[in-house]
Amino acid sequence: MDLSAVRVEEVQNVINAMQKILECPICLELIKEPVSTKCDHIFCKFCMLKLLNQKKGPSQCPLCKNDITKRSLQESTRFSQLVEELLKIICAFQLDTGLQYANSYNFAKKENNSPEHLKDEVSIIQSMGYRNRAKRLLQSEPENPSLQETSPSVQLSNLGTVRTLRTKQRIQPQKKSVYIELGSDSSEDTVNKATYCSVGDQELLQITPQGTSDEISLDSAKKAACEFSETDVTNTEHHQPSNNDLNTTEKRATERHPEKYQGSSVSNLHVEPCGTNTHASSLQHENSSLLLTKDRMNVEKAEFCNKSKQPGLARSQHNRWAGSKETCNDRQTPSTEKKVDLNADPLCERKEWNKQKLPCSENPRDTEDVPWITLNSSIQKVNEWFSRSDELLGSDDSHDGRSESNAKVADVLDVLNEVDEYSGSSEKIDLLASDPHEALICKSERVHSKSVESNIEDKIFGKTYRRKASLPNLSHVTENLIIGAFVTEPQIIQERPLTNKLKRKRRATSGLHPEDFIKKADLAVQKTPEMINQGTNQMEQNGQVMNITNSGHENKTKGDSIQNEKNPNPIESLEKESAFKTKAEPISSSISNMELELNIHNSKAPKKNRLRRKSSTRHIHALELVVSRNLSPPNCTELQIDSCSSSEEIKKKKYNQMPVRHSRNLQLMEDKEPATGAKKSNKPNEQTSKRHDSDTFPELKLTNAPGSFTNCSNTSELKEFVNPSLPREEKEEKLGTVKVSNNAKDPKDLMLSGERVLQTERSVESSSISLVPGTDYGTQESISLLEVSTLGKAKTEPNKCVSQCAAFENPKELIHGCFKDTRNDTEGFKYPLGHEVNHSQETSIEMEESELDTQYLQNTFKVSKRQSFALFSNPGNPEEECATFSAHSRSLKKQSPKVTFECEQKEENQGKNESNIKPVQTANITAGFPVVCQKDKPVDYAKCSIKGGSRFCLSSQFRGNETGLITPNKHGLSQNPYHIPPLFPIKSFVKTKCKKNLLEENSEEHSMSPEREMGNENIPSTVSIISRNNIRENVFKEASSSNINEVGSSTNEVGSSINEVGSSDENIQAELGRSRGPKLNAMLRLGVLQPEVYKQSFPGSNGKHPEIKKQEYEEVLQTVNTDFSPCLISDNLEQPMRSSHASQVCSETPNDLLDDGEIKEDTSFAENDIKESSAVFSKSVQRGELSRSPSPFTHTHLAQGYRRGAKKLESSEENLSSEDEELPCFQHLLFGKVSNIPSQSTRHSTVATECLSKNTEENLLSLKNSLNDYSNQVILVKASQEHHLSEETKCSASLFSSQCSELEDLTANTNTQDRFFIGSSKQMRHQSESQGVGLSDKELVSDDEERGTDLEENNQEEQGVDSNLGEAASGYESETSVSEDCSGLSSQSDILTTQQRDTMQDNLIKLQQEMAELEAVLEQHGSQPSNSYPSIISDSSALEDLRNPEQSTSEKAVLTSQKSSEYPISQNPEGLSADKFEVSADSSTNKNKEPGVERSSPSKCPSLDDRWYMHSCSGSLQNGNYPSQEELIKVVDVEKQQLEESGPHDLTEPSYLPRQDLEGTPYLESGISLFSDDPESDASEDRAPESAHVGSIPSSTSALKVPQLKVAESAQSPAAAQTTNTAGYNAMEESVSREKPELTASTERVNKRMSMVVSGLTPEEFMLVYKFARKHHITLTNLITEETTHVVMKTDAEFVCERTLKYFLGIAGGKWVVSYFWVTQSIKERKMLNEHDFEVRGDVVNGRNHQGPKRARESQDRKIFRGLEICCYGPFTNMPTDQLEWIVQLCGASVVKELSSFTLGTGVHPIVVVQPDAWTEDNGFHAIGQMCEAPVVTREWVLDSVALYQCQELDTYLIPQIPHSHY
């Protein structure tokens, strides 16, 4: 001890005295929630309420007998602060001395038991479906230990069954060991076990009534149920909700049968309280409690370590537990304090429970219950222990630590071995493994207890960094103490202390939920099985996530131990102890089992925690951020420390870099966040850190675990879980259950899953879907899929970081598998499926997975956003996540260049040589580490960065595997860096990310097909499954997953994936999370559906699995299945799938549109982003529908992905003819030619294709994309233009570079251009947001862009151009940062940037001229364009023409139109057909290389080429780079010819015309607005014509496109473009008006520059209006001006509003005073609705239906105050005098400043307006009449007259004037 015994005693006496003073006279415990009576006596609130409730009459104060009533009770906050501080002091003292105060903690424990248990019970009821079972089991447990065994196993669903038996067996023989783990080191425990048991049991019996029996049995359980406790935890969780009494009973029974019951009953009880309390706290205020609990757990952990070190410490720990219990009791009043104690308790309990089970992990929740019970028994036992073994304190500790650790390890190993024996026992293994892990952690902590004490103290005081500093010491101490026995343990200990500190910090930072999250992380880190077990419970609380993070870092540091990251760590330490040599492999097996079990547990836990998670998801997200940050830096430290001794020094070094970054990980998260500019970045960053930690280690983990995990096969279980979970919380449950199943199925996946499950759990909390789908598919292709799915899960959880982690895990695993041949990659990935197939395959899967991770992240963000209206309850967080994702992505992108390149190298190397990959990865990791995640997530990072990096890595890897693709691979590598450039601005970053994802995915698609050839079919199928899972998990992820699926299975999938990724990315950007929720929901469905799709793509590789999945998912998503059936059919035949998809889309389109609308409605305005997210799924608005009925939408999306993938994989040209594959054709062309660069375009193109086939879905996605990715699209468009340039120039490479720089230039140059282009696009986007048009528009834009680019690229030089385009796209994406990470492209970009700037300026002039010509052409063909205008909207082909900048905008418009006009619906057959036909035609034309098309030489197909010409023209117009004048003229001519020549070409022609319009008319703004106004009506009107007259639709589309091109031009030369836009718009308007008055009206409305102000809106609503205004190019101002046209008021459903200044000014000025519902409904319907229907009808003062605003607007020629002279006299409140004067002026009155200035006798009526209540002098205003001969009225006369817009009679408002004599 540091302090002398005397000093310690003195301090203890003082503290005891303070405690007595702060004790409640009734319960004799530290006062909890102190309340003071009138007589100034302080009692516990609970005690007083109990006292007051006992007597009917007036109660008396127990001390002074005065009457007291409930009303007289007052909360004593100062006293509660005293108690809180005292508890902190006690905790600190305990940490310093290892002593515990049984008194206070016993009290706390006791008191907390009842309230906390009750709360927990409620929570558990919500969170766990097994609660009743658990209760029954627990009830029967006291009667029979065997029953207990059975019940835990039942509760755990076989997780605990085997384990329970083993645990019991072990526990009974090794009861002392287990208990020793709890109380002290094994030796000490063994020595004192008997005493403890007897004394403890006796004490427990004594305390039993108070729930101490639970604790006692817990202690005994700790002894006997170390492994058992995990099983029991579930029981306890279930049981606890029932009552503390049950626990007490069980504990009493346990006491009676100390060995038997303590083993089982105690464990159950203890566990149950953990789960229950934890859940309760998570759900209820216990969130705060939990935070405290976590903190306390941390403290306890440290203390427990101390206790482990010293018997005295152990005793102290028990005392502290008692204190913790007391604190828990206090928790209700000082939640933080309780939490602190609870955290300490959880720590202690964790140590005990680590030995027991998940106690610690669950302790955060559990501690609240168990800590008190456990604390009491612990305290008493510790006290006895102290009395018995004070002398043992010093010397026995280290021995005991080691001995116990060894014993524990042996137990754990036994358990693990036993578990390994059974696949069904894997759960038990997980439990046991987690147990050992916890035990190890506990032991480590014990070993470290002294060193940790200060650290913990710091934690207690919230000094994380100090703790961090201490951690290394702890680590060293731990290593010294248990270096031989536990190599992993120190890490765990470090992790725990770090986690503890982090938890504490989190608690301080974020409050309950953050703390919960911290705890989640901590628990997750601590052990996967346990963490997952708890994670289901605690992940909601952040604790698990935190643990995960810690574990990840620790594991990384640990090397081999790292592989046992969560579960692996404990297992590893166990194995290290037992078989240090066989550590890696056995550990991996054990870990695999543990993780499997953990996953299973997790799946179960999610059921329990689902509600909790849902409720605390958002909070958890916030916490997550904190956790990750806090956790990350400490983890880094840990990593560094542990790394030194880690067997994986290389990894460690990488991580050391990462630790710096990791320690910066919090910073990194923050940095990334700032860089990204996304708030959510933090969480992703944290998750990234986690991912990094996990990822580095996960590889090890995965590598080690795969073989062992292979034995676990729970596919059917998985499926079962998945199917049930889908209905339940499709995402969450599936996540948990599927994940478990997946884990069971594949060792590696299990490992990953275990790691990710925790993360995913967190993620699941944010977007539950993510994990589930991944897991689900993991079952089929367990390893790869699970990894991907786990990745997805992790990704979902961190959404970005997790994605990285997952991505990195896969790549790293693969690489590390190769890297450290100790666990061969084959061994490491001993998946029954893909990983074993090929390391390169694995790598590609890894890459794909990382891509999936990124997509998952993006999807998760979208899902989260969508969650708001969808299944999940994290709409806000998802949004943040979305932002975070982009931020993270951006950060990743920044880092990504390196990482991506590394990844590609790695992947390539892996594909070519696994051994090579090892060094490459090491190098890459090292190089990438500066990027924090680079090593961890080179793939994921790249993927995250743009999905291009990782995707590219994948594709490059595939290419590396395949000679044909190697060049693109190399291209991809350099492109990866290009993708990295997307570091540039956040917006660009997101866009870049999207594009990169597209490029990457295209590239991936490209490479995937080779991958398949290479025998990656399994992996692809795994990827496919994963991607399905991912899709299900996240829409964005779905794209990625689709991509992966495509890679593995079919290009279609990749295409869809890319499409979705692009959309998703864009959506994420646009929505940054809102769409995520819906998208995730859709994704879930999609994921469900995707198995079938997966199957399709899987047929060759894993047909059976897909079938199984298919069956499974068909059940879950029959609709989707139905939709998916075609996909499945076209699995092998991706083309057929696309066709079916097209037909599906055709049939689905109306539904989709409707669904989109529904989704939007569901999304509502608050969830506008979600709506946009829905738009992401817009192909069939089934997206939202998917959330509900995944099948159609999922299928659509999947089909979309597959279709696209099919195009990609299948020879693009072959697929070109297919209607459904029109876009895929483009995509394929792009992909085929330039799999890397076209990837972006292709992705967009695929998006376009998908949009065409599932236009609504894609429209939604596009809408979102257009919102967030509009700039991306613009960039894409620019890239496309660049591509056009390159195509036209036939200089794909150099031109591309030029284009790249030009793109950059355009980006920089066209920031305005982007603004306009984006603006128009945004307008459409906004409309899309308001109407869903924008998204589709954007999607269309990106689609067209991609398509056009793809066509051009494919025609020109598919690979070269495509690659160049990809580069350009990536460069473009990075826009300003093109040069940053463009490796080769970078310099080119820079050079070309200058050149392109000059060229662009020249081209801008040319474009303006050409636009004028185009305008003329448009005017000539005005009717056609206007006729086609809706067509344009719905004509993806036309959009394709606009594919370049113009295309992007027009694509958006087209998509919007498609959505609006139900392009997928009515035009889906034809629109889709037309689109596809056009694509087909384009493809065929491309192939045919019509001369007309050849005009934009890159394009080779007549119709498509014409459109492409339009593209090219628009591109040149927009970029100014291309020979725009001549080309445009040519295009115009071609368009004319085509329009005149052919209907199908008409489609193309219209696209030309629109292009002309775009070029000739800056009609984009108006076009978009027009488009948005008109798209639906237009589309609906033209729907039949569109389908019947494809040409007409394209015309409309082209008209739309033209404005967009114009917008692009505007972006380049804003003024000219705007002018042209106006002119073009007018021309378009004329044609439109001819054909569509409605369109014309909307056009006119758009034509008239709109300006709006808002009044009475919340910030969220204002942001929605802002987006709406941006979409429709409406000026949004804060103050009302003369230019203002609209005043948006917050109203109720009847359009009744409050009266505000802007309300009066709007009426007085004759503005549109409309309800906020106008904005929301417009966003929902993706078009600007007529304001008439939303005009404010009344206000709360003047009547609910006085129609004042309408009257004012319609009678501006009849001013109500005409002929009046009004003097606003005196002070006015709530309204400046000048504003009041302005109001009366606007109403026709002449304003007089002074009373003396009235003009008399001129026929003007003077009126004086005053506000009597504003006058300080009571009667001052009464004398005004003395100064002038004018009536004096109140201000209400003005306000009422204005509001009603009827001059009111003065009589009512006259102020009586008092004669002057009265004064």
Curated annotation (Swiss-Prot):
Quote the biased-composition stretches of kind Polar residues, using this chain's numbering.
705-716, 1373-1394, 1445-1470, 1610-1624
- On this chain, the residues bearing N-acetylmethionine are M1
Zn finger intervals (RING-type): 24-65
The principal localisation class reads: nucleus
Its UniProt pathway annotation is:
Protein modification; protein ubiquitination
Which GO terms fall under biological process for this protein? chordate embryonic development; double-strand break repair via homologous recombination; fatty acid biosynthetic process; mitotic G2 DNA damage checkpoint signaling; negative regulation of fatty acid biosynthetic process; positive regulation of DNA-templated transcription; positive regulation of transcription by RNA polymerase II; protein autoubiquitination
Residue ranges of every copy of the BRCT domain listed in the record? 1642-1736, 1756-1855
| Domain observations | The BRCT domains recognize and bind phosphorylated pSXXF motif on proteins. The interaction with the phosphorylated pSXXF motif of ABRAXAS1, recruits BRCA1 at DNA damage sites. The RING-type zinc finger domain interacts with BAP1.
Recorded protein name is Breast cancer type 1 susceptibility protein homolog
Lineage at the top is: Eukaryota, Metazoa, Chordata, Craniata, Vertebrata
